Each structure stands twice: as C-alpha cells, then as structure tokens.
Amino acid sequence: MNFKRKLWWAQHRTDVYKYSTFILLFLIVTISIIYFTYSKFTSKNEMTMYETTVEPFIKNDYFIASYIDGEWSNEIPGKEDGYVVDKVVCDNGAIGTWNNDKWAILIENATKKTKCSVYFELRYIDNVIAEAPELAQGMIPVTFDDAGNAVVADTHAKWYDYEAHEWANAVLVNCADNAIKSKYFDSNNKVLASAVGKTISMDEIMQMYVYIPRYKYQLFNAENGTSNPQAINIVFESKTTAKSTGTKNGEWLTHPAFTFGDKELAGIWVGKFETSNTSELPKIVPNVSSLRDMNVSAQFNTSRLMTTTLASTYGTSTSDDSHMMKNMEWGAVAYLSSSIYGRYTNTSTCIDSGCEVWINNNSNFVTGCAGSSVSSSEASTCNAWNTATGVNASTTGNIYGIYDMSGGASEYVMGNYNDVIKNAGFDSMPESKYYDKYIGTDYYADFTKYYLGDATKETLKAKLTEENAWYGDYSKSVSSFYPWIERGSNCYDASVAGLFSFNVVYGNSYSTFSFRVVLSVL
C-alpha cells in the first residue's frame, strides 16, 4: 500500500504542486479583491481619504461600504457629482463622520476592526451654498405656487436658489393623523416619491421652516465702533471647513450661530412665522394670531416639544433639537437678510421694496402680515404673506423668506445677562447651549458686552440707547435689572421696530410678546 502511494506521489507530484499553487494564487487574488473592495474605494476624480483618532489602527483596519441611492456600489461618487452623504453607519460602537471638504470619512471611537457604510444620495445644490440643506426627519421640502400654496419639492431638482433670494423651505405635517402621514411618508419616514408635486393643505401643516445655511461673514464693525446699514459680505461654508476666527474689521468670522454646544451645524431651520396655536401644540403657520402671554420659561419649554414628548406628532426625531431662538440665531438671519442673498441685489443696490424688512403692523398680531409701507402705524388690516405687498415683510422680499421679524409681536430670544433669571420662571437656567450669556458692566448703555454676530453692537449707528440701531431701530443693553433680550419690537412701534431692533425686559409674560422656534439637525 505504501509502495502504491509512493508510486502515485512520484507520478503526480508535479501536478499537485502546480494545481496547489494555482489554487493558492486564486485564493490570494479573491481575498485581495474582496478586501480592497470593502476597505478602499476610489472615484474617477480623486482617492478617498480615511482618518482615525485611534492608534495604532491603520487604514487596513477599516472596511468602507458605499451605497448610492440605496444600492451597493464598488466605488464612491466624485465630489462634484452632485451627491451628498445622507448618513454614515459604523459597527462595533465606532462613529463615522463624512468630511465634505476632503470628501473623506473620519472614524472615531474604534476599538477593533470596523465596517462603516456610507450612504450617498443625489440631491440638488445651487452651487452657492456649500452643502445641500440637511432636512430633519419629518420635514417635507417645499416650493410655493403662484397662490402661495406649499408644494412638495423634488430634492433632485431645483427647489431653492439663494442667489435669487429664494431660501430653502420645509414643513412638518400632522403625523398624529395616519392618513396624513401615509400620504407623504413611507415606513422609514422618507418622503414618498409619489408625493412630489402634491399641494399640501394648510390644514395638514403644523409648522413651516426656512433654512439658514452655514456661512462666514467679513467683519465690518468689530471694534465697538458705529456703522451704517450695508450689504454684509457673506461666504457659505461646509460644517467641516476650518472655522474663521477673525476679530478685526476686514477679517472673516464663521457665524457663531452654527455652533450648537459641541456640535458644528451645516445650517439651522428657523420658524417662518412667530409661534401660534397653544403651548401644548405649537404651530408655525400664517394668518393666525401669534402665541403670547407666556414668560420665557414657558416659551422655552413649548419650543422643545417638537423633538421631545411630541416628536411622533410632528414626525420628528428626538435625535434632533428644537429650541427657542437664541439672540445669536436672530443675528444669523439678520445678517443673511442684509446681504446679496437677502434684500440686496448687489453690494450697493437694494431689492425693489428696499433693504429694510417691512413691519407687520397688524394690531391683532396676525402672523405673516405686512403694512402698506416699511414703517406703517398699527392697523387692524392685513396684507397677507402671499400677496404682492405681504412679501415685503419677509427677510428676502419674496415668499421664500422669514416673516414677523419686524413688528408683529415682540419676540423674546434666549439671550440673558449673567444668569439673572428675574421673572422668567426658570428654577435654574437651562443648558448653556440653549442661550447666549452676556457678562460685563451692569449698565444698560454699555453695548460692549454683546457679541460679534448677534446683530447688536455691530449694527449701531451711534453708541446710545433707544433709536440708534440700523434704520432707527431700538437699541438697549442687558443688565441685572432687565436681564432678557427682546427682538424686532411690535406692531405698535412703527419706525423703531425692525430686524435690527433689540430691547431688554424682565422675562415675564406680556400680551405683546411671542417667540420663535429653531430646529437643528444634529
């Protein structure tokens, strides 16, 4: 038997070596192809870059899977191909973040071999803003028809144009009603393709929002001087771009409103109108009386409902954050409005209705109204938001802007002097990310305590209180006596009301005070 085996081996040894070598090479090639398919992807334009904060891991410890419009792909789209990253999902507790500037993935908290799946979606981008708007869960992107009706937008096609002063808009519908929810969303809370082009009834809409993309601006009055109304130079940027940190005139500053706690935001969604309906079920819609007679604490608590206890009603996620507008966020809207993307056509020319946002002079505090002129006295009549005159009261001078920021109700914002609660109703101040804290001299005429970007000390025509902000709007500084900030003034204030108006108050409820909601995608 042993002799036969030896004889067989002697006769077939060469063949065995040959086929074994072939099989081994085949396995090596196959394994290599599989490995490199999952660990490295290249586009036609450039090599992707992978970074990690964990040592001693190297590139080969990560496996990257690419999905384009839901389908697996063995390559990633190029940076200029019109795709955006919808999400990055990593296993084993790792966190993946996509860097749009480098067109690369950053992997953190990896403790073992890690696979990250990157989901790319084709979305429209207008080549002006740096990133396509990040829609929160439950948001339906919309455009407006000639009658002012909200129409479900196709995010693969043009639905905003910041160069043409058409800011991105989105709505939340009543997802507590299954008939409404199933009309617009699939089981994964994605907007149905079949919903595109449908008109959304105002009865279905709970809230309307406008997108303020992340930007940096060129400092024009950074050293506690004075200035006149002007077109502010703005450059849009990605949240992964290194922040500009200028402090002097002519330098650039990434607007602070786009830093929320320890998160850098691609933009913020701002309530299109003052808040309305009830404190238990807040709405943001036109043609209704705004929600008033609430102290700051009650307003703040109401603003949080959309991403906390009432998230299922609005279709939103508790992973995102709705909150009461901060003073700095008001400033971000004001500066974008005072730019070539808002009410200027170029650096020296205003749009037809002027550079100043027109007042909402409706004495019943109806949202979205406009007076017959920029500073009309109060009246019970209303030029509605979707009329030729009504759009003059928006930040863009058209239907795509934000309303009620001049007149309407006075708006409390989350800006406070040195944690003095006064009559606001808080037991203690909320987390620091939810308000702008001002310190410095306890004097109402000292404006140096304000910050760059909040549209206060930079937009003073004279360093005096009362009618000395841009366009003669009201100006006053917080102190321990009046620790809370009010913006915009109200319908009774005529010429001192405006986008750049800032006053100070106790924080208690008033029949003329409302508030605004901001929603951040985290």
What are these regions (language model features)?
Residues 62-84:
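Solvent-exposed, low-complexity, repeat-rich "mucin-like" stalks and linkers
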Residues 76-102:
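Surface-exposed interfaces of beta-sheet-rich extracellular modules
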Residues 125-250:
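N-terminal module-boundary/linker segments of secreted carbohydrate-active enzymes
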Residues 199-207, 237-405, 521:
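Short aromatic-cysteine micro-motif
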